[in-house]
């Protein structure tokens, strides 16, 4: 301040100049009264203690105070909170903090979040002994019977010890058998329990009794008399030697092919009630009855003639026959059919559809070896394909000739040259291997041609060279050799007569062939 408040400011002064420089007051505070008014109540009265409803100051607790968790006036820091969280509440599976149960909690026995001390356990145990009494319907504590109570036999709230039980038994035995005389069939007395061996011996009579244990173990055998159990049907069927057979279980043990048993006689062959295995044929049974509807299981062997007078025979299985006749016609087997028309045979077929699935058109392609195994083994890949899918021959547009060169072609009479030095008709002629296709050809032959001198203007062509022999042979070597035409007519039909016509109608074409008719070739691929 720039003035002397001690000597010059009166007690009544309200506004004295104030400089806020280097203070925490804002710059607009410029007099003392404003500065005093700006001081907060905490600056005048001090900062209050913090609570759940009042802002203020508070202490930071120690780690132990945080772990105890009972102080409500101090603030937890992150560090002490982390320490507390490292000690979780104890459970049945986690180690941690716990509190002690009160007496009421120990007695109630329902709290599962607090531990019980030995003192609290004693309180709970004493309470159980005082309040939890054993009855016929609930577990609990019970007192030992006194001797008078045991002998009186009237108390229903105490327990008997072995000693008290023995003392009561002595009393009761004395009442029942006042003397130690042996019991007989006519007099009361004491008895001794017989052993199993004594019961089986069967000689003891007076003074002995049979207990349930001895009775149940004195089983009947082939050597000893005794008790025996009636067997179930399953036990009787399994040949159990320790049970007795009743009329019902005897009747229920029907005879089978694997088990002896009772049987019922029948005069009718075939299925009976209970199955064929439970019935037996009587002496007068129809082994093969003539009433119809019979089923014969197994093999039927007929040594002589089998005659069906009326109707027919419906056979759904396999009939294995080595020969015979049906209505005068011989029975043919599958093997005989294959020998007649074997797989791989080719025949002409006058239709565009196959006779059966056993045949294929000879139009190329393949078949499946798994579907046609005999074809695959016999023909193989001769006509293409592969072992899994062998090929079919393609015979469309082809004639067939014998394979190889036979005796007709190797005969000397058709081989070599004739008396004029010309090759005979068998020279060079041969068939191919099976499945080989030969292209069309024309045998070598000659034509008489017109003569021409040294000229390059032949109407149907001529050779390029001109050193061919002419009419004067050795003296004429400068001639060309002229070609004839292909056999086609030269003049139009309208201008020709018999003199100017070369050939018969429709004789000339692209092929050299005889008269023919086209049919389908088919091949057998399976039986």
UniProtKB/Swiss-Prot annotation:
Domain of life: Viruses
A molecular function (GO) term: metal ion binding
Record carries keyword Magnesium: no
This protein's GO CC annotations: virus tail, baseplate; virus tail, fiber
Major localization listed first in the record, in broad terms: virion
Signal peptide residues on this chain, from the entry's feature table: none
GO biological process, one term: symbiont entry into host cell
Claim: Transport is one of the keywords in the record: no
Sorted UniProt keywords: Host-virus interaction, Late protein, Viral attachment to host cell, Viral attachment to host entry receptor, Viral tail fiber protein, Viral tail protein, Virion, Virus entry into host cell
Compartment list: Virion
Pfam families: Collar (PF07484), gp12-short_mid (PF09089), S_tail_recep_bd (PF14928)
Subunit composition and interactions: Homotrimer.
Family: Belongs to the tevenvirinae short tail fiber protein family.
Role according to the record: Structural component of the short tail fiber. Adhesion protein that binds irreversibly to the lipopolysaccharides component (LPS) on the cell surface of Escherichia coli B strains during virus attachment. After at least three long tail fibers have bound, short tail fibers extend and bind irreversibly to the core region of the host cell LPS.
Name under which the protein is recorded: Short tail fiber protein gp12
Species in which this protein is naturally found: Enterobacteria phage T4
